[in-house]
Amino acid sequence: MAVAVRTLQEQLEKAKESLKNVDENIRKLTGRDPNDVRPIQARLLALSGPGGGRGRGSLLLRRGFSDSGGGPPAKQRDLEGAVSRLGGERRTRRESRQESDPEDDDVKKPALQSSVVATSKERTRRDLIQDQNMDEKGKQRNRRIFGLLMGTLQKFKQESTVATERQKRRQEIEQKLEVQAEEERKQVENERRELFEERRAKQTELRLLEQKVELAQLQEEWNEHNAKIIKYIRTKTKPHLFYIPGRMCPATQKLIEESQRKMNALFEGRRIEFAEQINKMEARPRRQSMKEKEHQVVRNEEQKAEQEEGKVAQREEELEETGNQHNDVEIEEAGEEEEKEIAIVHSDAEKEQEEEEQKQEMEVKMEEETEVRESEKQQDSQPEEVMDVLEMVENVKHVIADQEVMETNRVESVEPSENEASKELEPEMEFEIEPDKECKTLSPGKENVSALDMEKESEEKEEKESEPQPEPVAQPQPQSQPQLQLQSQSQPVLQSQPPSQPEDLSLAVLQPTPQVTQEQGHLLPERKDFPVESVKLTEVPVEPVLTVHPESKSKTKTRSRSRGRARNKTSKSRSRSSSSSSSSSSSTSSSSGSSSSSGSSSSRSSSSSSSSTSGSSSRDSSSSTSSSSESRSRSRGRGHNRDRKHRRSVDRKRRDTSGLERSHKSSKGGSSRDTKGSKDKNSRSDRKRSISESSRSGKRSSRSERDRKSDRKDKRR
């Protein structure tokens, strides 16, 4: 350890000597010793200035500026006092009065006109010409003056050119000197910086060496102390005590050995820590030296960059002196650069176009997805609409069932009565029943097994009835009125249908056959003006719930025929009752009156007879009423056997009456009387019912008549 302390002391001495050398170099550069500390008072005096502080010095400076005339003039004080000022004012007043006196005298004195008049001298043209023409002496004088001026100007020009050349040379020399001075200054700064950095590094080394020396000395002292302690036994308890027995025994010998082992272990650990600490202290200056090296590298790079900048400046000067020799090359390079820029711009434009196309494709895809979603939503919503339609259909079916029960009672009651009041009220009841029937035509039909059975029966009836039936005969004028009334009634019924029907339904409103219209032409020319209207119900397209079967045509045929025959019975029975009360001469008038009172029944019978003969026309008109035929056939299903007997008898009687009606109108009365006998027995039981129901429907009939009249007026308009 003593050797280590000596080596450290030697290193410390060497470092001190090198530091002294650095201080001397700094003194040479700066002219002062870096170890000398400046006095604090001198700094304060230099900073504060002659005033000794901020405020005083600034005031003195301000006063100095104002006195020198650079700033605003200071206020001048009058030293003479107030008396001198007053005396001066009096003097100025006296002087102003003296000056104003002679002016007042001039104003008072009268002005006199001068007797001397200046003669006007007019120069002639010759005099002017002579003045312009110069003598030879004047010309020579002018030439000399002009020559002198030109000579002076040329001299000035020459001197100016020489001066410019000299100035250029001076400027070049000054620039070179400035560059050299800057380089020298930079070198001096770099040297100074390096010297100060060396000085700092040496100082750090000295400090480290001093610390090492101190630590080494402490370690030596501690080792000496440990060498003394190791001979004693150390207690296990703290604080540790060292003792030695007077007489040694094996137990004490063991304790000494154990304590020595422990102490040696402590000493070794302490030495290791000391060595590590010294290594750390040596590593610190190494790190500092690495930082210094990095700084030196950065400085060298800066110097190289500065030198390159100086070379570039020299090259630029050489290019300026030699001229623009490389302009062509530069122009070509500029053109190539422009072409490159244009190509870059084109590529950028193409990229932008591609991006726009991609955006458009993405938008199209998004729109398609939205459309698909909307269609799925609509498909989901369609089943809900179908369920609503089915619910409406079920409600309509319940209503139709109730109406069928009412109609069966009404159909049984609609037969002739002996009283004239019943004759007038029965057609009104039929008109009230008719809109309900038309409403049923628009409602959806029921597809059941019973409906199919009824269709088969109706087809068999058609085959039996189509063979013996003759051509229909047109009835007189009163038939046209109920047809028009039915048209007027059917239009509001069709318009008030609910939106449950999915398809467009074209409804022909009781179109008469061409034969009937031809025969009515000479009887009612006024009625031709009213056109037969067909009403269409257009609704939102929904999946069809109801389907119209071709078999419905046959159903409507049978229904219309059965209705016409039942009403022929009533009309004939009524005509016979009226003819029995009146004389044979007035039978034609009474029959016409009865037919006019029962307008609805006669019109319906004519329409039914015309539909039976004209097959295609009746099928077209009855295609719209397919759904109601099934309900009618059910309501009439109870009295099929009775209806067959009546229909056969009615057909035979029609054959007999058709020939008579063509020959003369009065023959209808006789035919109706003959047919009455067979029907009276069957119709007597039903007359009582019709009377009671007709009395109930009296109020309704009056309202229906008003509605009919209003509809007629609207159509005529």
Curated annotation (Swiss-Prot):
GO molecular function: DNA binding; RNA binding; structural molecule activity
Residues where Omega-N-methylarginine is found: 54
Modified residues (N6-acetyllysine): 238
N6-succinyllysine: residues carrying this PTM: 238
UniProt keyword annotation of DNA-binding present: yes
Coiled coil regions, renumbered to chain: 2-32, 163-234, 287-379, 446-467
InterPro entries linked to this entry: Pinin, Pinin_SDK_MemA, Pinin_SDK_N
Region of interest called Disordered, as start-end residue ranges on this chain: 46-139, 279-717
Location of N-acetylalanine modifications: 2
Phosphoserine: residues bearing it: 48, 58, 66, 96, 100, 114-115, 347, 375, 381, 443, 450, 552, 658, 692, 695
Keywords: Acetylation, Activator, Cell junction, Coiled coil, DNA-binding, Isopeptide bond, Methylation, mRNA processing, mRNA splicing, Nucleus, Phosphoprotein, Spliceosome, Transcription, Transcription regulation, Tumor suppressor, Ubl conjugation
Protein's UniProt keywords contain ATP-binding: no
Comp. bias regions, Low complexity: 476-498, 576-630
Cross-link Glycyl lysine isopeptide (Lys-Gly) (interchain with G-Cter in SUMO2) placement: 109, 121, 137, 155, 157, 228, 280, 304, 311, 359, 365, 528, 536, 553
Positions of the UniProt region annotated as Necessary for interaction with RNPS1: 2-284
Tissue specificity as recorded in UniProt: Expressed in placenta, lung, liver, kidney, pancreas, spleen, thymus, prostate, testis, ovary, small intestine, colon, heart, epidermis, esophagus, brain and smooth and skeletal muscle. Expressed strongly in melanoma metastasis lesions and advanced primary tumors.
Family according to the record: Belongs to the pinin family.
Oligomeric and partner information: Found in a mRNA splicing-dependent exon junction complex (EJC). Found in a complex with SR proteins. Found in a mRNP complex with RNPS1. Component of the PSAP complex consisting of RNPS1, SAP18 and PNN. Interacts with PNISR, CTBP1, CTBP2, KRT8, KRT18, KRT19, PS1D/PNO40, PPIG, RNPS1, SFRS4 and SRRM2. Identified in the spliceosome C complex.
Biological role: Transcriptional activator binding to the E-box 1 core sequence of the E-cadherin promoter gene; the core-binding sequence is 5'CAGGTG-3'. Capable of reversing CTBP1-mediated transcription repression. Auxiliary component of the splicing-dependent multiprotein exon junction complex (EJC) deposited at splice junction on mRNAs. The EJC is a dynamic structure consisting of core proteins and several peripheral nuclear and cytoplasmic associated factors that join the complex only transiently either during EJC assembly or during subsequent mRNA metabolism.
UniProt name for this protein: Pinin
Organism for this UniProt entry: Homo sapiens
